[in-house]
């Protein structure tokens, strides 16, 4: 089907999760608007409620009022943490405000490098002691967190968020360098400042945080979801569609816009809206995922579907996450010709998608299968949608 019409983009999932976790820093009332209605946000709200947060959600689930008084439990249970990778983000605020935390480790005690090590080693520099026992991180900072100079060994969105939140209540000054600079991190930083935090970006990937003792009430509107926006732009490009995307900041989407122009889409952009018209001929392209402002790993699966329709062979190199090619077996069921070599997918073009019964493995795989179904011949049934 050719998509035509106008779509208003939801609030950002990837900004909502750390912002919700950051509310744990304060005992004041906080109001958040433009929350997206997605499973991970609901799970994060349940996690906060299980710890004692008082949460009121509006009928349309778009606005939330939250208050975290002194009766917050400093434990985040496995049951909720296991369904959401971002749950680890409560570690920083709990240690900053209460000096202790018992948080289920995402993925338990796997041997070898775990991304969580970046969080823990950085927190150690701020005075945190920790042990991992039975899949739980038992951490404490008996004398409170102390400001430190921290250079992340690798760019990590989660570690940047956790340490930025934690540093807001630390004694003295913290300087974080080699930070992730995704727009969602800038949104988190703006939210923390709206509560009274002292945060200054002193370089492209460097931020200075001066600890404060108390926070004030805040009303904050969460930014738009750039991954949803990118997905909708691809939906417009894939089958000669004609879509108007609103509720966005087009300057944040420059990478996606440039990519789609290269493959042949016609794009007319204004500050808060984009009109995209898909071309009959889709040009092939080779891409690799990388930290912002590079191609987002969260849009890789959707781009793969688009490149299945290209005129020649394309490649996608996944440089951020392992296990990010899980949609490929399902796309093959729909007639896609894709070969995986290590962290690279080789995509043969000119695919004529055929309807099939398929199963989603994660949120982005769900979106990619919907895109494939849009231009498939026949009926497609997608189960386990996220």
Predicted regions span which residues?
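Short, structured segments at the rim of ligand-binding sites
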Residues: 1-386
């Amino acid at each position: 089907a050719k998509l035509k019409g106008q779509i208003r983009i939801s609030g950002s999932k990837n900004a909502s999760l750390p912002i919700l976790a950051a509310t744990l820093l304060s005992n004041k009332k906080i109001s958040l608007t433009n929350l997206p209605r997605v499973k991970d946000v609901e799970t994060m709200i349940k996690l906060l409620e299980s710890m004692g947060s008082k949460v009121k959600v509006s009928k349309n689930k778009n606005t939330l009022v939250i208050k975290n008084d002194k009766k917050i439990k400093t434990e985040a249970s496995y049951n909720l943490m296991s369904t959401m990778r971002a749950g680890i983000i409560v570690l920083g605020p709990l240690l900053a405000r209460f000096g202790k935390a018992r948080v289920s480790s995402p993925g338990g005690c796997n041997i070898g490098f775990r991304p969580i090590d970046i969080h823990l080693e950085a927190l150690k520099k701020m005075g945190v002691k920790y042990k991992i026992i039975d899949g739980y991180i038992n951490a404490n900072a008996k004398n409170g967190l102390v400001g430190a100079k921290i250079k992340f060994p690798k760019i990590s969105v989660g570690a940047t968020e956790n340490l930025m939140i934690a540093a807001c209540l630390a004694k003295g000054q913290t300087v974080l360098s080699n930070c992730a600079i995704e727009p969602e991190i800038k949104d988190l930083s703006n939210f923390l400042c709206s509560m009274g935090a002292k945060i200054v970006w002193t370089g492209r990937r460097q931020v200075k945080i001066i600890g404060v003792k108390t926070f004030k009430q805040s009303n904050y509107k969460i930014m738009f979801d750039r991954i949803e926006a990118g997905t909708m732009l691809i939906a417009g490009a894939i089958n000669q569609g004609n879509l108007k995307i609103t509720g966005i900041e087009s300057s944040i989407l420059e990478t996606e816009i440039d990519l789609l122009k290269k493959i042949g889409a016609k794009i007319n952009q204004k500050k808060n809206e984009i009109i995209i018209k898909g071309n009959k001929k889709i040009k092939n392209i080779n891409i690799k995922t990388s930290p912002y402002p590079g191609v987002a790993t969260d849009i890789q699966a959707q781009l793969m579907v688009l490149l299945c329709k290209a005129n020649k062979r394309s490649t996608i190199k996944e440089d951020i996450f392992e296990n990010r090619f899980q949609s490929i077996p399902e796309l093959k069921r729909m007639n896609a010709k894709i070969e995986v070599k290590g962290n690279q997918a080789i995509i043969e073009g000119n695919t004529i998608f055929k309807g099939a019964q398929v199963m989603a493995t994660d949120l982005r795989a769900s979106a990619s299968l919907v895109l494939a179904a849009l231009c498939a011949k026949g009926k497609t049934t997608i189960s386990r949608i996220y």
